[in-house]
Amino acid sequence: ALGERLGWEVVSSDAVRKALAGLPPTQHHYEAFEEGLYSPSFTRRTYEEIFHRARNILLQGGSVLLDATFRSRALREEAASLAREAEAEFLVLETLCPEEVIRERLERRAGEASFSDADWQVYLREKKIWEEITEVPPDHHLRVDTSATVKALLPGLVRRLGGGLE
């Protein structure tokens, strides 16, 4: 929704991962944490494709929103390097909300057609290995409380991101 409102191309890790595996984008495909489609090697391949697509968009003068976890500093630094290479502004949008909201949303999403296969257990494992964002300058790191609905959050985010961070 955000990318569409801003007129930015969206590259989603969930959609890219499933495309690489030859799966329909909204077909749920559950595997053990860091196995199969979610193994370190397949995850690396997924991020390589995300960066490839983003590079093409940026070099054609477009703007791109990378919708992915970016749980490690190394991946975020790789994205920042790509932006520098394309002479594009790099912004990190970190989404935060209470765990009870996260759990409820993940449980509800399990019954819907969705790109994402993440469930509560995946969230808990991701949380344990998440590397705090310390490598991005504060004026390029936007922390957003996403407790509210997308509809409620969108206008403020579009205002803030439409002209970059100030």
Regions found by a protein language model. Name each.
Residues 12, 42-46, 75, 102, ...:
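Helical mechanochemical/support elements of P-loop NTPase systems and associated helical scaffolds
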Residues 3-62:
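Conserved substrate/cofactor phosphate-moiety recognition/catalytic segment
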Residues 15-18, 70-72, 96-103, 148-150:
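Conserved nucleotide-binding/hydrolysis micro-motifs of P-loop NTPases
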Residues 70-71, 79-83, 88:
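Conserved P-loop NTPase nucleotide-binding/switch module
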Residues 111-156, 165-166:
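Small-molecule kinase domains that catalyze NTP-dependent phosphoryl transfer to phosphate-bearing small molecules
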Residues 60-64, 89-91:
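Loop/turn-to-beta-strand initiation segments
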Residues 31-41, 85-133:
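A glycine- and Lys/Arg-enriched "phosphate-lid" helix/loop adjacent to the NTP-binding pocket
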